[in-house]
């Protein structure tokens, strides 16, 4: 049997039973204890990915500093799934907005190595540009999409729905 509880009720109960108003040490958001919320930590981490992707690009090919910016919107072509439905759009968007594929390209670049230096360099540059895109999206709060709405992400609601729960 399942019991539906409100968000407020969920925040007031932990494994040891009901919390008092002054017992904030067991909350999961960290903010009550003076810490950072998990979404904030994730945004900071993704900002670091952006910095590392730029540094990697500058290290590999300083003259192509503009490359991550030039291909930035190409990764957003994955939103084409939204023409079908929010669920299809979330699936195609999330399939592209993950660190898995940039990692696969980076490994392919390493494997190509000295046997094909031009291929290796371009695979690595594309992987860095892809990681730059994903990292910047998440650092700005554009997380992985949930199937119910484009504006509903794993980091919360975005756009006109930010700070609300429209459903």
Positions of the model-derived regions?
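N-terminal membrane-targeting hydrophobic helices
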Residues: 2-167
